[in-house]
Design a protein with these regions (language model features):
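Signature of N-terminal electron-transfer/Fe-S-associated modules in redox systems
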Residues: 1-161
């Protein structure tokens, strides 16, 4: 029998102390232990992007990370970005551009899109495509998603002017 391990981390700005089994992945920890179900589990191989979260400021696939690897880290989920209002404009653009249908990929897409917009305030469509290429959507055909990210980038630039 494998013994549980202690971890301490910040999740969406709140300190979390937990006992976890060494093989528990971060996605399952977030969903099952913390009830943060916006992080979806799709492929469980790190290729679909549905489980994307931000760890120490970088996006990672939570299905490939063990919960014990987050000890001492800062993790942000889609709930943290949504509740804090950081992506309200991006969420509105996804809605207005019909960039979501079933919604399964949406949290990961929003996490990746916000990551891009933090790196590059004015990405062109090719850069948007490239940055989102690790996130799969089987419903929208991607054009509406790219439109939503581009619309958000333009609006944010306009607000700064």
């Amino acid at each position: 029998m494998t013994a549980a391990m202690s971890i301490s981390l910040d999740v969406n700005g709140e300190r979390v102390d937990a006992q976890v089994l060494p093989r528990l992945n971060l996605a399952d920890f977030l969903r099952e232990h913390l009830q943060l179900t916006g992080t979806h589990v799709g492929c469980e191989h790190g290729v679909c992007g549905a489980c994307t979260v931000r760890m120490n400021g970088e996006i990672v696939r939570s299905c490939l990370m063990l919960a014990v690897q987050t000890h001492g880290a800062s993790v942000e989920t889609i709930e943290g970005l949504s509740d804090g209002g950081e992506i309200a404009d991006l969420q509105a653009a996804f809605h207005n551009r019909n960039a979501l249908q079933c919604g399964f990929c949406t949290p990961g897409m929003l996490m990746a899109a916000q990551d891009l917009l933090k790196q590059d305030a004015e990405p062109d469509r090719e850069r948007i495509r490239q940055h989102l290429s690790g996130n799969y959507c089987r419903c929208t055909g991607y054009q509406a998603i790219i439109d939503a990210v581009e619309t958000t980038a333009r609006a944010r630039i306009g607000r700064r002017s």
